[in-house]
Amino acid sequence: MNGKKKKALLRAAVILCVAAAAAAALFVVGKWEKMETPVDAADTSDDDRPEFYYAGAWYTQNTELETLLIAGIDKYSDQLAETLELGKELDANINTQQSDFLMLLILDKAQNTCTVLPLNRDTMTQINALGMAGESIGSFTGQLALAHTYGSSGIDSGYNTVQAVSDLLYGAQIDHFITVTMDAVAVLNDLVGGVTVLVEDDFSNITDQLPQGQEVHLTGSLALTYVRSRRSVADQTNINRMARQKTYLEALYEQLKAQPAETFSAKALLELSPYLVSDCSAAALSELYQEILDSKLTVLDAPEGESVRGEKFMEFYPDEQKLQRLVIDLLFIPAEASAG
């Protein structure tokens, strides 16, 4: 092959690579821009801030904070029949998915902190039933996980989950949300090179790859087994699983911080986009990701309360007084201070 042909082939290869990269970028951006109203920043005016009366004083939401709700989505066939029956009674639009885990990220840019509040999926709260056009057609009291079940499993289900969490947290407004199917756990886990955890639960009925009392480097589907398993471990409560998810999240965060900042967020968005739904644009997600990595991360324990077995499924009832105090401490400030 002569030199001219080699140069021509080289130019063609370069052009092809650039075109492929551009197509990938357009795919990611296009995926988010097709959503109804992607946003780039919180848009909460002072007049719209919720007020909360607690212990003889008025509080208002701290608008200097930015909040992001993340929900991991999975299918729950055992609860599907009951959900379908209720959906039929309400003439609601429902899907086959529920929230497997939920956590609220609270970013304080002034203090350079990111506080993570896990929420128990079994928490009993007010849930909106949605019609075919995404409109509210009624409400009922049910597990927080069910908020995602009402809607198309797309952006309408995401907003419905945001509303349910907001109602649970005494009207606190939530700026953004991301819902991600649980299949993405293995993808993200391997993107950071795996995550090492100390296995404290007995997984012997599930796998011999998670020996109790030993450190294990999680890769692939083993990471999903670690964060999702509940019924076949010794302690089958969701509270126990949430403690395990907290351990994993803290280890994952350290791995994320070790990734090259210039390229990793774009790569992660590209790999995870088939699993994600969000109200944010791709640019906003990248910005949020960097803000989280630049912050000091604190993962709280989930709100305290009581887990009881309902007629068919577990129900969690938070301690109202402790939850009110927690919400005030995390999200609200005295009304006088906000006016000053």
Where are these regions (language model features)?
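Non-catalytic, solvent-exposed segments at the cell envelope interface
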Residues: 2, 11-13, 23-340
